[in-house]
Amino acid sequence: HEECVIVPLSSQNISVTTNHGEFHLQGREGVFAAVTDWLYLPNGSSASLVADSGEVAVCTARAQSDFPACYTPAQNVPVEVRGGGKASRQVTNIATPDSFKGARKINVCEVITPGGNWSSWPPHRHDGIDGCIATNEEIYYFRIGREESLHGDPVGLGTFHVYTIDGSVDESVTVKDGDAYLVPQGYHGPTIAPPE
């Protein structure tokens, strides 16, 4: 029993055929180019995707509740700026509890961190907190731009930190474009983008 959110990352003109009907996603050239439209599919859905090219994220979560299939156009996706100063970042709330009533188990957002800024600050966790209504595992999927330079490496990178209260996990890792990092427990943050 898994629900699904389909998010174009660097793909356009996507046809999605499901047991709930046909859907068309406009998509975008890349994650830094624009906010994108997206599609939610409930438990028990089947789908096939056809696109001209590029990447599409298929995000899933185990769920007991059923919500109807739902297409959301890009102009209806809420975008906010969180934090301030060097901890400011743009958050695109795709399928979050505040933006989508079906987000009971699945929670999908994009965070764009300007060069030199910190995200996931202050560090936070979604497990073992008294009174917290959610226990979330997270998957961070990193897309990082390139900076052409005569003397430097054009491949972008960032830093990501996770740790647990008991110290069983305490890692700071270098992340590059296309890396994924699983956070099943504990604090995560900061994520640091190098200066532009």
Descriptions of predicted regions:
Residues 2-23, 54, 115-116, 127-180, ...:
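Glycine- and acidic-residue-biased ligand/ion/polar-headgroup-sensing regions
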Residues 36, 44, 53, 105-110, ...:
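Extracellular structured ligand-interaction cores
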Residues 1, 62-121, 130:
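A short, N-terminal "cap"/entry segment at the start of jelly-roll beta-barrel domains
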Residues 16, 49-51, 67-68, 121, ...:
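Short helix/loop capping segments that flank catalytic or ligand/cofactor-binding pockets
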Residues 38-40, 58, 108-112, 120, ...:
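Conserved hydrophobic/aromatic beta-strand scaffold that supports enzyme active sites
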Residues 22-36, 167:
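A cross-kingdom feature marking solvent-exposed beta-strand/loop segments within repeated
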Residues 32-52, 61, 174-196:
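Conserved metal-binding segment of the jelly-roll/cupin
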